[in-house]
């Protein structure tokens, strides 16, 4: 595949029409591999000897955030410099010149920023329920399976199986296994078609890695943040709550909060992160398993604005729906409040409405202050609590995206983001969701063990 990718890069320099296979904006492993494998197959089988160029729909600088992608590319010996990223090709200019044909893989909806490219879309291959209102008017192939790589495998094996080499087979095989959580029937992500094509790949290439080995390796790489900067760790799995000009980032971090807080120059990095991205506050949710294989969750609220920080902390501490069961943890910075979260069943998805509530309470207080730039500076905790009472009995519904962000495209089911708003099919398993499922399994096993010992 390396020679093919070099040909793709050379084709970018030619003044000729291009066929581009574009993955989704999350660029998770499924999206990346599906784009690579499908473009490679289409190039090999093109009667007109056209070249189909796989484009990873992120900036090159963002690839390190996707540890499983980086690991797998190294594992199958595909050099990163050979890949083509979204910031290295001007799709709009190509389209305006009449030189672009676009194939969407692992998504079927273009974001508002790419709306002009819809006319260039010639085909869609996706594994989520179709949204007719937004889907491009072209050939659309959609089937509810656990991994889009399964549909790419099917296309290859039904069309021209002789074109499939071991390197591409390894990419598809590992991706399906990761997406389908090692084909675990208890989790229920894998469909019969996913299982069928994993078995067919293993039959064609018996030396492919054992399922458990490749799943464990990819899963470990996916959660590994050891080589990331603080900003990369915060951006790796992040959502944003936005309300009337106030923005709060919520980042999932897969390590012990104690270790995170001991990072060199952490508070400088947190301040820079909030300043550079115009966040008024940052909520870090740390998630990991302890030595007894029990799930542990912790919270850290970083905010230089005292009134906003007190409001967020007050709402979280007082929350009963859901109850977080927070225990304060000492902090070395006055701008950061840390907690141990006793209720490990409260995921980020469940926390988002509580944070929306906190923003509403803060903005209500700001209105009462009538024009003060910093609300209630010097206000006592008891006074803040009185204001919080007005909002503490109800949760504010709404999206957890910036108001400027388009609600589309839906994020992939296996990406690092929590949920796809259009997906009503197979269960969604993000990194956060996989952790939550594993937590439930771990707790269930512990309960059974206690029962059997009685």
Curated annotation (Swiss-Prot):
Region (Essential for homodimerization): 394-421
Key words, A-Z: Acetylation, Cell junction, Cytoplasm, Hydrolase, Manganese, Metal-binding, Nucleus, Phosphoprotein
Segment forming the signal sequence: none
Cofactor note: Binds 2 manganese ions per subunit.
A Pfam family it matches: DHH
Regulation: Activated by magnesium ions and inhibited by manganese ions. Inhibited by dipyridamole, moderately sensitive to IBMX and inhibited by vinpocetine.
PANTHER family named among the record's database cross-references: BNIP - RELATED, EXOPOLYPHOSPHATASE PRUNE1
Family to which this protein belongs: Belongs to the PPase class C family. Prune subfamily.
Record-given protein name: Exopolyphosphatase PRUNE1
Gene that this polypeptide is encoded by: Prune1
């Amino acid at each position: 595949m390396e020679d093919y990718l070099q040909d793709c890069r050379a084709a970018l320099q030619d003044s000729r029409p291009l066929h581009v296979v574009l993955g989704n904006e999350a660029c998770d492993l499924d999206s990346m591999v599906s784009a690579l494998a499908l473009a490679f197959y289409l190039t090999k089988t093109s009667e007109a000897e056209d070249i189909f160029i796989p484009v990873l729909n992120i900036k090159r600088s963002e690839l390190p955030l996707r540890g499983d992608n980086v690991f797998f590319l190294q594992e199958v010996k595909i050099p990163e410099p050979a890949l083509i990223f979204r910031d290295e090709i001007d799709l709009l200019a190509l389209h305006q010149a009449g030189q672009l044909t676009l194939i969407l893989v692992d998504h079927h909806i273009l974001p508002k920023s790419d709306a002009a490219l819809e006319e260039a879309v010639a085909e869609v291959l996706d594994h989520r329920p179709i949204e007719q209102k937004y889907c491009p008017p072209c050939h659309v192939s959609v089937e509810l399976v656990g991994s889009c790589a399964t549909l790419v495998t099917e296309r290859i094996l039904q069309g021209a199986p002789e074109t499939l080499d071991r390197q591409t087979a390894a990419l598809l095989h590992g991706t399906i296994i990761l997406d389908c959580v090692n084909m675990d029937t208890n989790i229920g992500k894998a469909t019969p078609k996913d299982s069928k094509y994993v078995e067919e790949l293993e039959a064609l290439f018996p030396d492919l890695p054992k399922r458990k080995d490749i799943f464990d390796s990819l899963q470990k790489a996916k959660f590994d943040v050891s080589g990331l900067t603080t900003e990369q760790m915060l951006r790796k799995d992040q959502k944003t709550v936005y309300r009337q000009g106030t923005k709060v980032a919520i980042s999932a971090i897969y390590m012990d909060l104690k270790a995170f807080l001991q990072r060199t120059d952490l508070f400088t990095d947190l301040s820079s992160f909030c300043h550079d991205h115009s966040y008024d506050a940052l909520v870090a949710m740390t998630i990991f398993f302890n030595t007894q294989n029990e799930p542990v969750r912790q919270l850290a609220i970083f905010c230089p604005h005292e009134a906003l920080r007190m409001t967020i902390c007050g709402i979280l501490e007082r929350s009963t729906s859901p109850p977080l069961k927070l225990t304060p943890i000492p902090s070395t910075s006055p701008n950061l409040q840390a907690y141990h979260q006793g209720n490990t069943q409260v995921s980020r998805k469940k926390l988002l409405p509580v944070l929306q509530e906190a923003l509403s309470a803060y903005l209500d207080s700001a209105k009462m202050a009538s024009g003060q730039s910093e609300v209630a500076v010097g206000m006592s905790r008891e006074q803040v609590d009185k204001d919080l009472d007005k909002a503490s009995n109800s949760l504010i519904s709404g999206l957890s995206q910036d108001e400027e962000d388009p609600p589309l495209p839906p994020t992939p089911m296996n990406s690092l983001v929590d949920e796809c708003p259009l997906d009503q099919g197979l269960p969604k398993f993000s990194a956060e969701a996989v952790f939550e499922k594993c937590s439930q399994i771990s707790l269930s096993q512990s309960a059974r063990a206690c029962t059997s010992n009685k």
